[in-house]
Amino acid sequence: MGKKLDKKAKAAVAKAAKGVKAAKVDKAVKKFRKLEGKLWTREYLLKIAEFDGATIAPANGAAARADAMGTLAGEHHKLLTSEKSVELVRSLARETVAGGHVDDPQLLDEIRVLGRDQREASVIPTEEAEAWTRLTCEADAVWHKAKTANDWASFEPYVDRIVAQLKHQAELMDPKRDPYDVWLDQYERGLSAESFDAFCEEVKATVVPLV
């Protein structure tokens, strides 16, 4: 009789512990969704400002817009890479591996992708993230003027600065890889110069005979 009671007690404790664990994970998922929402809001506002600058915004407002976008990019970077945000994503990632308490395929992918974004962003200082956004915003405004005036000389310095900064960021993200491969992987995950060359050869072998 005592053994049966022990088994029932253990089962009850295990069930209660499982319930507590599930509640803890549910709470973490809600925090994760809230974090995603905050990040998306900042990304959305940055895209709206970028689109505005490329279309109808007054040309003489580029400097102010660049400053505002830089500040917002900094806030986004701080939120993404904060210790609290990183630990939240890591805790959920651990649940997917160890406990299996997260089984929604879409949520699993979102956790994986946001974790990857955090790892890549964390190696870049917030000040550099802000400066990069300001630089590209200013460069876009200069490009519009230079294109109209056929004035490459005024835009060339921005190209040099952008390329230099891209190389620097690639070095921070993955010093062992060629910068070109790092950025190819950013725009198409898993892509490299080698795999892209192989793809182009396949296309060439198929298309050229048809021309």
Spell out what each predicted region is.
Residues 2-159:
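N-terminal helix-rich structural modules
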Residues 132-211:
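Contiguous, non-catalytic segments that form substrate-binding/exosite surfaces or channel walls
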